[in-house]
Amino acid sequence: MKNAKFKIILLLLVMFVLVSPSFSQIPGEIVLSIQNGNDEMLSSYFNQNVELVVENNDDVFSKAQAKQIVAEFFKANKPKQFSIIHQGGKDGARYAIGSLVTSTGTFRVYFLLKSKDNNSYIHQLRIEKQG
């Protein structure tokens, strides 16, 4: 009986360790949307207001305004490749830093996600030209 309880507890611990990293990961759809230049998918993760820094735009914008600015950016800078360089976070907030290679050059991408009602929302997005 004790052996069975031990196995159950051990199994639960292993499952917890395997599952818990996925909660701290950046949603794959965000990475794909940046990689593919899909403003529609990316904006579905925008908070109602987004602090946005993209080219000459640097302000807090509504979700709709931010979507339009990002759409214009992707139209002018066709994405070729995107990869996450670093990510981290704590207490319901996560961030990622990535490198976006486009038809016009390479950009550093930073975004901050906060969780609300078990969903992740982008509160801050920065896309800045490198070099």
PLM regions and their residue ranges:
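A mature extracytoplasmic/lumenal domain signature
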Residues: 46-48, 56-58, 86-88, 99-102, ...
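Short, aromatic-enriched amphipathic alpha-helices that serve as compact interaction elements
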Residues: 25-38
